[in-house]
Design a protein with these regions (language model features):
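Charged, terminal alpha-helix-loop-beta segments
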Residues: 1-242
Length: 242
């Protein structure tokens, strides 16, 4: 079992027994997990849990100012079978997504109309992105842009990565762990779109076209001089939605 030492207190890894408890923690920490430039919409809160082709939530992401995206969110426990449960759920969402587009738009619009603060944030975002109104914005997100998914899970695994890698759906995994000391909790995670947020936090404005190219030496001489000679090896993280 993993442990975390903080301020001379030993925190032990907290095991979530119920998915709803894990999901509540994710929703509470959503601004930190997904970023201040994103809006997490808890669809279950809006319509209940009776419709199986509705994900746990939707994320309207303005990390890329001129290219906002919509992501479906699935909050899962590692105890769930990656093939029969997680993979099949995402496959259902992918298959039904376009056919359910009008209903999804209705859900999102209804949720935004009920929350003034959320609506104002979305409006400011789509105006910056060049959309004339919320209707045109949602039409573009749902019907014109590719579908992306984010699986938030307490413990990732090679099996899960393999399953998600077989889907045509662009999918990211966010591992969200909780450590507990008495009644005190600490959450550990790598933020979604971390590579984008690192640049934003440095005060630079991002454009999608500047993030889709990795430059490497094309000739053997350049490879030997820069990569080997100067030891210029860099680990880069690129989310599936990029």
């Amino acid at each position: 079992m993993e442990k975390l030492l903080y301020n001379n207190k030993l925190y032990v890894c907290h095991e979530y027994l119920l998915e709803k408890d894990f999901e509540s923690a994710v929703i509470e920490q959503a601004p930190h997990i997904f970023g201040e430039n994103s809006i997490y919409i808890d669809i279950k809160k809006q319509i209940g849990e009776s419709i199986i082709t509705i994900p746990d939530g939707y994320l309207i992401d303005f990390s890329l100012e001129v290219e906002p995206r919509l992501h479906i969110i699935e909050n899962e426990l590692s105890s769930h079978d990656p093939y029969k449960h997680i993979g099949s759920q995402l496959l259902k969402f992918a298959i039904s997504y376009k056919a359910s587009g009008r209903k999804i738009k209705e859900f999102l619009l209804d949720a935004l109309m009920k929350d003034e603060s959320m609506r104002e944030r979305v409006e400011a975002g789509f105006l910056r992105a060049g959309y004339r109104n919320i209707d045109a914005f949602l039409e573009s997100l749902i019907f014109e842009k590719p579908l992306n998914a984010v699986v938030v899970i307490d413990q990732s695994s090679p099996e899960l990565e393999n399953v998600l890698g077989q889907l045509t759906l662009n999918t990211d995994i966010v591992e969200f762990k909780t450590f507990k000391y008495r009644n005190d909790y600490i959450h550990q995670f790598t933020p979604f779109n971390a590579e984008v947020r690192d640049v934003i936090e440095k005060g630079r404005i991002l454009k999608p076209e500047t993030l889709n190219t990795v430059v490497v030496p094309a000739r053997e001489e350049g490879f030997e001089k820069e990569f080997l000679g100067n030891n210029r090896w860099y680990a880069i993280r690129i989310s599936a939605s990029m």
